[in-house]
Design a protein with these regions (language model features):
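C-terminal substrate-recognition/cap domain of FAD-linked oxidoreductases
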Residues: 46-52, 236, 240, 246-251, ...
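Alpha-helix capping/hinge segments and adjacent helical runs
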Residues: 436-448, 477-481
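FAD-binding subdomain of flavoenzyme oxidoreductases
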Residues: 121-276, 481
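Single conserved hydrophobic/aromatic residue that forms the stacking wall/gate
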Residues: 1-18
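Activity-critical C-terminal alpha-helical subdomain
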Residues: 200, 453-487
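N-terminal flexible segment immediately upstream of the FAD-binding catalytic core
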Residues: 20-83, 100-130, 159, 282-294, ...
């Protein structure tokens, strides 16, 4: 590797690819080190029950308990911890709300977990400059509602926005339905306060909209998945909040046709604020999970597009809606459902946001976060189904069709342990190879974390991966911070 990683080989896999339900983390802290870290006076957990609770996120099948959980309140406390762990070669895993889907917050090598749950204050809403300064432990939806009270808008809205932390969104470069019009987290981050793995505290940029001063460290930290530093303050730009929106649920008789309609809508000059794709089973499972009895799904409906338009002029929105209908008339669709009340809109969005949870109730599954140019969505969908036929698994697909981000859920169903453990990686590799061939990549918003590491060589040649390792080595010479993630 490009740098020495303490005295241990943190880069080796602790847990084999058999998707074990429980993985024993390495013992990385000796008794004297544990006593010293506890003596720092930071709130902590060492009870085994608590450690187990912190040892998982929303990734299917993995639990890696840390040896010590520290819950600091200030950057200076984090600095003391990291400086000591750097000197001792102790692995440190930063964690937010642990809602991630790639194992990014799993302490796979034991050691210390630093939980950011007490960094939960919105520090300043600047209504003149349309900015907000926040700590990373603020729940994303809480932040959105706080700025909305001032007529302002923070668009990125991952499905877990009601529970995830804004710091985790920055670490993962999270997206969500509104990314199709408004972009993802990186498009709103202006400046970050970060504690480096060696203990230094820095700001990465400036609280301005334009900055051509030196390397863009801010954007390097966004999406770095907790491997380069621990974010302690975030400055975000905001927008005026749209005053009007309209929402439509469009049923299609063929799933690939629904995907094909997506680029046609954009080609017509329409930029939706949301364009979500749901295969038949995705919507049916969400309806069953939520108890919905209002949204009709006919036997002939194979997929739906949930399309939102927003803006500041109701008449203009109606004109855009007419344009949208004109495009949809060129495809075979059934009767379009128009949500004309806030309650109806909320119910439709709730169905879409609950698809992921609904899938969990059906079977053991593996979710992939593929993204391709949106005109390639029909080809990707057809390939996923073809791979499923070859390997004998069912798949349920849904996601952010407007930006080509298709969540592929591989359902275990009746597959044997051997088939699931040994054939699944082959099937995923075939899907990812096609994604790359179509001009896409292996993760649009969930990140690489722990579970997607084996597939990184499909996305990048070795020279690029080595460059990433070199960057990691500059920030983290001993490789203590979130080891075993990304590459």
């Amino acid at each position: 590797t490009a740098y020495e990683i303490s005295t241990r080989d943190w880069s080796s896999d602790v847990c084999s690819s058999d998707l074990s339900h429980f993985c024993n983390s390495m013992e990385a802290i000796n008794e004297n080190q544990l006593k010293h870290l506890i003596s720092l006076g930071i709130s902590h957990h060492v009870d085994q029950t608590q450690l187990l609770a912190y040892g998982h996120d929303e990734t299917e099948d993995f639990v890696f308990p840390p040896e010590l959980v520290l819950i600091p309140k200030t950057p200076e406390e984090i600095s003391k911890v990291l400086a000591y762990c750097h000197s001792e070669g102790i692995p440190v895993t930063p964690a937010g709300a642990r809602t991630g889907l790639s194992g990014g917050a799993l302490p796979i090598h034991g050691g210390v977990m630093i939980s950011m749950e007490k960094f939960n204050q919105i520090l300043h809403i600047d209504t003149d400059n349309l900015q907000v300064t926040t700590e990373p432990g603020v729940i994303t939806e809480v932040l959105q509602q706080a700025v909305k009270a001032h007529g302002l808008f923070y668009p990125p809205d991952p499905a877990s926005k009601g529970s995830c932390f804004i710091g985790g969104n920055v670490a993962e470069n999270s997206g969500g339905p509104k990314a199709v019009k408004y972009g993802v987290t990186k498009d709103y981050v202006l400046n970050l306060e970060v504690v480096l793995p060696t203990g230094e505290i820095i700001w990465t940029g400036a609280n301005v909209l334009k900055n051509a001063t030196g390397y863009n460290l801010t954007q390097l930290l966004v999406g770095s998945e907790g491997t380069l530093g621990i974010i302690t303050k975030i400055v975000l730009r905001l927008l005026p909040h749209p005053t009007h929106d309209v929402l439509f649920l469009v049923p299609f008789f063929d799933a690939a046709t629904a995907c094909a309609a997506v680029p046609a809508i954009f080609k017509a000059g329409i930029i939706p604020s949301g364009m979500e794709f749901m295969e038949r089973d995705a919507l049916l499972w969400a309806k069953a999970f939520t108890g919905d009895e209002t949204v009709p799904v006919a036997d002939t409906h194979q997929a739906h597009l949930l399309i939102e338009l927003d803006g500041f002029d109701q008449d203009q929105l109606m004109r855009e809606a007419e344009q949208l209908f004109a495009v949809l008339e060129t495809f075979e669709t059934d009767e379009i459902l128009f949500a004309d009340t806030a309650a109806q809109k909320s119910a439709l969005w709730n169905l879409r946001r609950k698809v992921g949870e609904a899938v969990k109730t059906q079977s053991t599954y593996k979710e992939e976060d593929t993204v391709v140019p949106r005109f390639q969505l029909p080809n990707l969908l057809n390939h996923v189904k073809a791979v499923g036929k070859r390997y004998g698994f069912k798949s349920v697909c849904y996601g952010h069709a407007g930006d080509g981000n298709l969540h592929v859920n591989i359902i275990r169903g009746e597959l044997s342990d051997a088939e699931w453990e040994h054939e699944l990686p082959k099937a995923i590799t075939e899907i990812f190879e096609e994604v790359i061939r179509l001009g896409g990549t292996i993760s649009g918003e969930h990140g690489i974390g722990y579970v997607q590491r084996p597939y990184m060589p499909l996305a990048f040649p070795e020279v690029t991966l080595n460059l990433m390792r070199e960057i990691k080595g500059v920030f983290d010479p001993k490789g203590i911070l979130n080891p075993g993630k990304v590459f």
